[in-house]
């Protein structure tokens, strides 16, 4: 049992979770956290105890061991632009105040993303984890999880005893990863292990479309990591793929190894994985296909087709307002498609009309004309007006249960394509986004999802074909076309590292 001197261990639980795309002009505000998940105290337990989320896994272990969990704050916003200084400082102040009021504690479970950037702190996660360490002192174990899209910093590692990355992308093992972190925390509290973390950062970053963990080339790394996990004294081996849309000094792929006080083993394991990635680095550069080439191929493929809009990847920070793929279907006219478009202004206009009304409307943005605002003009029929709330109760990317698109209007274009226009940004991680509002995914030829790999966990259950489209936008697949200022150099594929 999790006890010391006959009393339950006291373990704090807190997290600040954001994947920040520094190429997006629109900043992430405090309101964005409020519109996503800003939970305090028992709200955290109620939301995640039974969820397929890392917090759910942590709680399961703590409950089993009789640990007193002290839930403080969990703040998460949909991936987007850099977090404003005001939003970060407000969240940090609340978090540290709550933690200070809770001391003394025996341990601290933390839930960072690992790719958070604020206006004043490029290494946002390293900064807030460091503040947690300052408060609790050097002897209180800090154990947590990170997203494999983290850009891991030395500061993150130095502030914690153990960080464990999810092993899957799409992320369907978050609850299990939280369980692993919870088990390590119990062992730390009982004094049966003394974690030592080793970080390796090879001069390589992996293209986003090559980060699908169930397929080659990612399987090269994960299969080797599984073998290395069997080494004596190794507690965890994390393959951290990295997030290529954050211009930070820590950008890139990394390997994080946790051992039981065996620094030599940790270094050896990390170096094995580093050498493997460098040797096979060219396999991690994707082959990109144009929209027109994919559209021409669709007629002979089994339907429905999942068409992934990589340039407007909401899970990577994009707005989710691109009409590039919708316009391609509209021009062609032979395939019936579905897509979601974020456009609160269009929603406000459409909400004034009754079901069945024919409306000429401007919505979305045509990124093929550049990054400035170029809305799409169409005549549509209003199908339905809904509140945009839905739930997901199965293991899906992100592990969330409650979703809220805000006020939402379903329309159908003259070409027969159905568009869900919504007022809050929500990534396409759940088929309930369709089924909750009476839409049958199997009734479409093409389902457009604004993502790269993450939507596959949900849409792959109904789509027989998956295609990643090389579309324009702030999450365009070819990161070498983007202007970086502070990323590390040399870094493959930007620079040659053969010498």
Task: Give residue ranges: language-model regions.
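Extended hydrophobic packing segments that form well-structured cores
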Residues: 71, 278, 390-499
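Conserved anion/nucleotide-ligand pocket segment
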Residues: 178, 182-226
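Hard-cation-handling environments
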Residues: 9-11, 209-416, 420, 424
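Generic secondary-structure signature for well-ordered alpha-helical cores
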Residues: 63-67, 97-104, 134-137, 165-168, ...
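Low-complexity, highly charged intrinsically disordered N-terminal segments
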Residues: 59-87, 91-98
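Short acidic, glycine/serine/threonine-rich loops at helix termini
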Residues: 23-27, 81-84, 120-122, 153-158, ...
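N-terminal amphipathic/basic leader segments beginning at the initiator methionine
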Residues: 2-64
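Active-site histidine-anchored catalytic micro-motif
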Residues: 12-19, 23, 33-34, 85-92, ...
């Amino acid at each position: 049992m999790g006890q010391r001197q006959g009393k339950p261990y006291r373990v704090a639980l807190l997290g600040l979770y954001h994947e920040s795309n520094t190429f997006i002009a629109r900043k992430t505000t405090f309101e964005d956290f409020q519109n996503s998940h800003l939970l305090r105290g028992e709200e955290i337990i109620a939301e995640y105890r039974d969820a397929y989320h890392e917090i759910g896994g942590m709680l399961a272990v703590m409950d089993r061991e009789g640990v007193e969990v002290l839930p403080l704050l969990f703040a998460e916003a949909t991936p987007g632009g850099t977090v404003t200084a005001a939003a970060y400082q407000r969240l940090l102040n609340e978090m540290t105040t709550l933690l200070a009021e809770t001391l003394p504690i025996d341990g601290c479970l933390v839930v960072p993303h690992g790719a958070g950037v604020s206006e004043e702190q490029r290494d946002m996660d390293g900064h807030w984890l460091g503040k947690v360490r300052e408060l609790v002192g050097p002897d209180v174990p800090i154990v947590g999880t990170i997203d494999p899209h983290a850009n891991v910093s030395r500061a993150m590692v130095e502030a914690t005893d153990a960080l464990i990355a999810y092993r899957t992308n799409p992320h369907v093992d978050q609850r299990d990863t939280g369980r692993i972190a919870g088990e390590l925390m119990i062992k730390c509290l009982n004094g049966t292990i003394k974690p030592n973390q080793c970080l390796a950062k090879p001069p390589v970053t992996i293209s986003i479309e090559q980060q699908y963990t169930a397929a080659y080339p990612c399987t090269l790394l994960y299969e080797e990591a599984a073998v290395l996990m069997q080494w004596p004294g190794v507690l965890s081996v994390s393959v951290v793929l990295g997030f290529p849309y954050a211009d930070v000094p820590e950008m890139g792929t990394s390997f994080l190894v946790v051992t039981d006080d065996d620094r030599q083993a940790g270094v050896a394991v990390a170096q094995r994985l580093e050498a493997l990635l460098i040797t096979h680095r060219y396999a991690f550069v994707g082959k990109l296909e144009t929209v027109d080439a994919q559209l021409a191929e669709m007629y002979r493929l089994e339907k429905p087709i999942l068409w992934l809009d990589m340039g407007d990847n909401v899970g990577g920070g994009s707005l989710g307002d691109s009409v590039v793929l919708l316009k391609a279907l509209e021009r062609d006219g032979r395939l019936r498609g579905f897509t979601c478009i974020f456009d609160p202004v269009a929603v406000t206009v459409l909400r004034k009309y009754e079901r069945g009304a024919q409306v000429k409307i401007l919505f979305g943005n045509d990124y093929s004309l550049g990054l400035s605002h170029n809305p799409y003009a169409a005549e549509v029929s209003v199908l339905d007006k809904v509140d945009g709330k839905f739930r997901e109760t199965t293991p899906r990317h992100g592990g969330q249960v409650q979703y809220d698109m805000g006020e939402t209007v379903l329309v159908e274009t003259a070409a027969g394509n159905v568009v869900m226009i919504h007022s809050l940004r929500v990534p396409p991680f759940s088929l309930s986004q369709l089924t909750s509002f009476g839409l049958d995914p199997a009734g479409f030829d093409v389902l457009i999802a604004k993502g790269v790999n993450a939507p596959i966990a949900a849409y792959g259950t109904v789509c027989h074909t998956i295609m990643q489209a090389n579309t324009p936008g702030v999450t365009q697949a070819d990161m070498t076309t983007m202007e970086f200022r502070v990323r590390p150099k040399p870094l493959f594929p930007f620079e040659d590292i053969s010498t």
